[in-house]
Amino acid sequence: VLGFQRDDILDYVFNNIKIKPEIAESIVENEDLYLNNATYKLSDTLYEMTGYKNIFALSGSDANEGAIKLASAYQKIIGQNKRTKIVCFENSYHGSTFLNYNMGDSLFEDPLYTMKPYNEVIRLKRDFDPSSVNWDEVMCIMVETCSYGQQLRPNSQDFWDKITQIQHGGVVLILDDIFIGGGKTGTFVGWRNLPVMPDIFTMGKAITAGFFPLSATMYGPKIAEVLP
């Protein structure tokens, strides 16, 4: 998106991460977290491009963990405390932290890092039968825009129809757009051409073209309206 090893970008980043007197003073006095203008500008730009508010993080794993925490907070705020389950799909990859790794598939598993049982995760096949799940217990469903684990083969219209129906039943829909976002599908947001509108979606390397660690958990009006 931005090119490779551009000196102007590297110089801008370097100049902005050098600690400034006001930042040092804020840290010493334990005042509120200091945010520079670039943070606000990027947040505003992403909102203008997507219509979603955001929470910044460092990695895709962080963004996906944040998405699940947002979904959990949303369900609790609206009084749906029984919704604790997380639904994901086979041949998926959502990160390397404990929860996200358990949501992935054995394709990414090795003898030194085996899956641990996590009772809140339900992993389904792509041709799943919706009646096989008690959706009243499900907090959120996480889907990759286009899964690396299934060789980037797009999901079927029938698959997305099921997902939309489940979303309308009160389950928070999270789209993991980290791998495929950033223009790979013809739009900056990878899911724009899909027949679906997520409540939350996540972005990663595409934001900075890999120049430095940054990701974002993007949340729409449904979530924003209930957050304190």
Predicted regions and their residues:
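Conserved N-terminal phosphate-binding loop of PLP-dependent enzymes in the Aspartate aminotransferase
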Residues: V1-P228
